[in-house]
A protein has these predicted regions:
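Long, low-complexity C-terminal extensions of enzymes
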Residues: 106-252
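Conserved FAD/dinucleotide-binding core of flavoprotein oxidoreductases
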Residues: 10-64, 82-95
Length: 252
């Protein structure tokens, strides 16, 4: 993976031959690639071809994704990047760091050492935060299951070698119906059905035909139209009194 400084541009290439590229219309631009399928020099050349100019100097950053098997051992508590690295997007690490700290402060931290560092609180912390990262892995893996097969990297992804049991089961459900929200992680901080719905629809796992069938409630068009109207009205009622983004930020 490497990052480069770039001028503002209205063009972007979100997915390249060996993984993905950050948006070009940002001040910082980069290309995340898998060195099992492309060399750093090849990735460098592809990035330059995509953005249309030479990139010098360039900074290469190597990483391995994964998490600690045990996040809390005795008096050592791993938080944030010490606990896991999922992907080179700051929002993911910020989110998981906040969730870990929130769990520790509200569910574990006591007035004494024994209240805080007992076997029960430690085991609960390790179980729930390990689950948080594992479900994050499922969510990220699903982003790549888009059926692309034009390079060796995408052929490898399409073979299912990097998929997970959860992603495979959700894709099987999507062939026949819209997955119910209860199928998705319900732990605080985990990606739930709203976020999964965008990924499944965007990658083609959930088709418009299946979604329309679900909305129609067994081909009852009247019920489907009523449900659609209800959701639109509900959205309008919630949003009409909200400030726009600029006003909200100014008043923070």
């Amino acid at each position: 993976m490497f990052f480069v400084r770039s001028e503002m541009s209205r063009y972007y290439c979100p997915f390249c031959s060996s993984r993905y590229q950050f948006y070009k219309n940002r001040r910082g631009c980069g290309y995340v690639f898998c060195d099992s399928f492309v060399t750093p020099d090849q990735a460098h050349a592809e990035l330059e071809q995509t953005i249309g100019r030479k990139v010098e100097p360039i900074r290469h950053i190597k990483f391995d994704s994964g998490r600690q098997e045990t996040l809390w051992i005795k008096n050592v508590l791993s938080i944030g990047l010490c606990a896991a690295f999922a992907e080179p997007l700051e929002a993911t690490s910020i989110h998981t760091t906040i969730m870990q700290l929130k769990h520790f402060v509200y569910a574990c931290l006591g007035q004494t050492q024994q209240e805080t560092c007992n076997d029960g609180t430690v085991d609960d912390y390790n179980l729930k935060n390990g689950h948080l990262y594992d479900t994050m892995k499922d969510f990220l893996v699903a982003h790549y299951t888009c059926g692309r097969k034009d390079t060796e990297f995408w052929k490898y992804i399409d073979s299912g070698a990097t998929s997970t049991d959860f992603v495979r089961s959700i894709h099987e459900v999507c062939k026949h119906r819209v997955p119910n929200s209860t199928l998705f992680p319900r732990q605080e901080g985990s990606a739930g059905w709203p976020l999964w719905s965008y990924v499944l629809a965007g990658t083609g796992a959930l088709t418009s035909e299946v979604a329309e069938k679900e909305v129609m409630f067994n081909n009852d068009e009247q019920v489907g139209d009523s449900a659609y109207t209800y959701h639109i009205q509900d959205f309008d009622n919630m949003s009409k009194d909200l400030p726009d983004n600029t006003d909200y930020i100014r008043n923070m």
